[in-house]
Amino acid sequence: MARTDIARRVYNHAWKLDPIIRSLIDTDFYKLLMLQMIWKLYPDVNASFTLINRTKRVRLADEIDEGELREQLDHARTLKLSKKEMIWLAGNSFYGRAQIFEPEFLAWLSNFQLPEYELSKKDGQYVLDFHGSWKETTMWEIPALAIVNELRSRSAMRALGPFTLDVLYARAKAKMWSKVERLKELPGLRISDFGTRRRHSFLWQRWCVEALKEGIGPAFTGTSNVLLAMDSDLEAVGTNAHELPMVAAALAQTDEQLRNAPYKILRDWNKLYGGNLLIVLPDAFGTAAFLRDAPEWVADWTGFRPDSAPPIEGGEKIIDWWKKMGRDPRQKLLIFSDGLDVDAIIDTYRHFEGRVRMSFGWGTNLTNDFSGCAPTEISGLNPISVVCKVSDADGRPAVKLSDNPQKATGDPAEVERYLKFFGAEDRIDQTVLV
């Protein structure tokens, strides 16, 4: 793939040349896996998604021009899958399985375009909402986040001259490459790019993916970004997300249905996928509650992705549960992906080496680490914690508790109700940086 002079491209920036979202598959692979399940099993459910800036001190409406934001959102709505993309999705093997996407689903997807959005301002923040059919609104999550993050980066760099931009990107490349050099010390490492949603820019994410591909070779197992996987001949990686149990819980009519919501989703997932896609995301309503009530068959799944507890504490809790269930952790897989940088990756790898199979999803600190790279400090280049979460399903409020109270989302009264129902044990309050 030809190298792009990112600094020159930024300095000579023209919007028509560089739309932020270039393709509907410039998204995370698990969005397509989940979309097929939603399309097949929940076609009539409505769900709303809402942008949430957890870094309250950053006033996004003051940093990002509303006209530019609308331009980018409107452009994303014009996109449809290309013939090349359709052929690749239909003909490629994912996770060792051919035709993972059903022909009827792909036929529907071939005509898909992103639905309308609602945008306003309140107290220095953007209020960005997506309402409608779940199988349509779900696809806004990743492009909306990528647009907001890249517009913030562009705004921060707008006044920089060509030489300053050269220095900025040269330092960022050197910083990222120094991380690659440290990862080479870990024999048997398996790591993938999870950095689409909060990336500095598409071009920077592509550079990081190419650098990992060359720098650590087979240890780099792929990217969650479907477009980059296709263009770079890499594995598209990813399993499932919190939105599935969040919607199932919101739709629950009884306490029993609420308690069983996470396990119902796993049963639904197993109807469509198997093998290495049988990865449990346990923390939507707290990992302790999930493990306490989990049916024994959950222990037969391939692995877990502990997403909001500190990685070592979260991993140990799951290993203890596997042992309690009579399973050998050495045959199981833990995927660590929450706010990781190279120090946490190395510490976690060395802690669990030989005790469990491991894989790492490297996100924001891979694709958006420009701290200390500008000749003078530019706060707009520091990543923020911004998410796009389900806010309601069929008009009923949706909640995520998480193992970290700082990551809880939903109406405060509903969050409190869920806490009383599922319990609040073993939750660890940590500052959320990304």
Curated annotation (Swiss-Prot):
EC number: 6.3.4.21
Pathway where this protein functions: Cofactor biosynthesis; NAD(+) biosynthesis; nicotinate D-ribonucleotide from nicotinate: step 1/1
Alphabetic keyword roster: Ligase, Phosphoprotein, Pyridine nucleotide biosynthesis
Phosphohistidine, modified sites: 242
Entry GO terms, CC: cytosol
Listed GO biological process terms: NAD biosynthetic process via the salvage pathway
One Pfam family hit: NAPRTase
Role played: Catalyzes the synthesis of beta-nicotinate D-ribonucleotide from nicotinate and 5-phospho-D-ribose 1-phosphate at the expense of ATP.
Protein name (Swiss-Prot/TrEMBL): Nicotinate phosphoribosyltransferase
Classification of source organism: Bacteria, Pseudomonadati, Pseudomonadota, Alphaproteobacteria, Hyphomicrobiales
